[in-house]
Amino acid sequence: APQVENPYPFPLDTFQTFAFDAINKKENVLVTAKTGSGKTLVGEYQIKVSREKGKRVFYTTPIKSLTNQKFHDLKEMGYSVGIMTGDIKFCPDADIVVMTTEILCNLLFARAQWATGVKPVQSEWLASLSLNNVDAIVFDEVHYINNIERGKVWEQCLMLLEPSISLVLLSATISEPQALAKWLGDLKQVPIHLISTQYRVIPLKHTVGNEMIMDAKDRFYPDAYNRWLLSLEKIKKGVADHKEAVRDRRRAGYESTTLAKKDRKYSFVHQLNQTVNSLDEKGLLPALVFVLSRKKCCEYAAAVESSLITSSDVASIRHIVKFHLHRFPELETSTQYHELMGRLEKGVAFHHSGLLPILKEIVEILFGRGFIKLLFATETFAVGINMPTKTVIFTSFMKHDGQGMRMLRPDEYTQMAGRAGRRGKDTEGLVIYLPDRDPSPLGDVQRMMTGGQQKVSSRLDFGYEFVLRTYYGKDMDWKDLVKTSFWYQQHLANVASYQADYDAELAKRSVYSIDDAMGEALAERRSIEDTIAVSVNATKRAAQKKLDEWKQAHPEPEWERAWKNQAAYAVHTRTLNNLSVHMECLARYEESVEITVGFLRANGYLSTQLGLYACSIREGHPLLMSWAFHTKLFHNLDIPQLMACLSLFMGGDEKDAPLTLNDSTFISDKSVSAIKELTVYAKKLEAEEPSYSNWEMDFYWLDVVIRWVSQENAYQICRDYGVYEGNFIRAMLKLSNLAIEWCTMAEQAEDIQMLDKLRDIQPLIVRGIVVPDSLYLRM
């Protein structure tokens, strides 16, 4: 390892030493390491080095909660820190600005668009978020570049950043990171150091029941898992026999409460309490329990019987909660608040995306300080939030991914399990599988726990959003931009791979010495042979005669040898044809983008005011929302009805059946007419558009928005519609951004009447519990 000065009061790991050396040379770094390995220190060292030079640093994260937490952590280190997310904007000219990656991407495109007359949304904030004097950008959780929906944002940022800005990329372990590193090295023409480590500072032990199924060296023990499955089967049989005995006694006229109570000990809740008590006795708390369902998070937290903390801890919790939440008196009417407070006084809590943001943060603060001994959380808690624990418990390995239920991928399991084991506190982290339903099969579990990590693939797409952003950006020709992308590097690699396969297949086929003319003659014989096989009588005799004539015209041994080889020759020919099709498709990517350009031009979105509107939109559907404004479709609606129409672009909440327009009670006839007209236009575009896009509008929030903008109570609305309070806040903040985008188009159009109508819209939306605030900003 290179010799570097260590500014910290603890020894550096080897991979950190290599990373520090690269940063000192102002060279780029890509670190891939497991959760809890200390890769965050690399980003913090870059900040230290840049600040010593008097330079600024941007720090990007994939989620708002991680952004808020990182803001607090860096502020605690004594730095001048700003924060920029979709909801919170504070001190964008600070020495260090923490932001979501989408904010950085919007800034990079906005810089190119200002020069062409496009006014991006919230341009005053973006203008103040200057790249001037920025020495480096830290991309935390950069493995998000692999995310199907959002990965393109990371790729676009890396494409558009100037080579003079140093890059520190921090990633979970990924497969074949060399391709990503090579692309960045070629693109920036700056050396990049790929520093990968599989080492875990705190080893993990993975268990089921009393069986260890994977050790600290990642050796999986299938026999142990099978023994546990067998023990579960015996228990299940015992429960079934017991229930039958209860039924027999009841049929005989007896009522045995003793027997009836026995099956409770086999219930999941009983096993959960038994496990928690055992962990408490053995000093293996705190524990993080992953429950991949928001509803069950709350249910299981409520089912914990024991108190896991002292009366002194309870007093401390009350003091901390009062200190942080006294500014939010409206919480007293929140069901979630009272549910959570009841759990907290036992040292138990829950954390999921539907929880009020400030309640999520109070849980994080209390967990970080050691007052929460048992936390039930969904997967989002594993993403980046630096909250290690002693023990991790999985209640299921199955998750819903929007398409259906599936097993966790190896990378997802690794990240979640990796929360176990606290550096400097534990010698070992414990991971327990305690299924709340039938356990996953052995093969699925083994693949999940020992399988390889996901290969990094480009998620860049060339839909209308990409074309609009590049078309209205100064010096942004899409053809040139594509050639700087990770997608293009992978595209060239695929072309080369297919060409190599084609050449190899051609060489294999050439062994059989069958040219095209021979191939046609052999195909003729195959046809005759097929006729003989299925014919009878005169037809068969005629075909046999044809075969004899064919053999006379094509004498042995050359033709007989060719006939024997023709099956293999045909297989190689089919493979070559398939490869040709793939190569042709790869060669035509420019054509597919040109079709999208033609689609936008034909519908009036290029070199037009309509196109400028569309280019301004980030939250809503660019084409539909801009068209609705351009045609004044919603202009005659009052404010609650206009906001309801904008809610069409907010996306729905999880419901078994999507709502329809007819399900709305409060929508006006004028709004219904406008929505139907917009739906017709959307169907027209969907029929014309060359590639798949989402043209669906969602009616889930119509009545919720009308009632909220009409000044009704948030908690009552949530109760009436069964909406999680956290989801409600997130949706209303998105509505606030949609209203800002609508105002931006009105400013571009100099539509004084619309601007006057919406002058006071924000206080109607952003009020009460709907506030873009974070406890981390005030700590």
Region roles according to the model:
Residues 1-29, 55, 118, 203, ...:
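Helicase-associated low-complexity/disordered flanking segments
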Residues 58-60, 68, 75-84, 267, ...:
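Conserved C-terminal RecA-like helicase domain
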Residues 93-109, 346-360, 365-387:
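Conserved two-lobed SF2 helicase motor
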Residues 159, 166-168, 173-185, 189-303, ...:
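Conserved interdomain linker/interface between the two RecA-like ATPase lobes of SF2 helicase motors
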Residues 349, 354, 368-372, 459-779:
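Non-catalytic terminal extensions of ATP-dependent helicases
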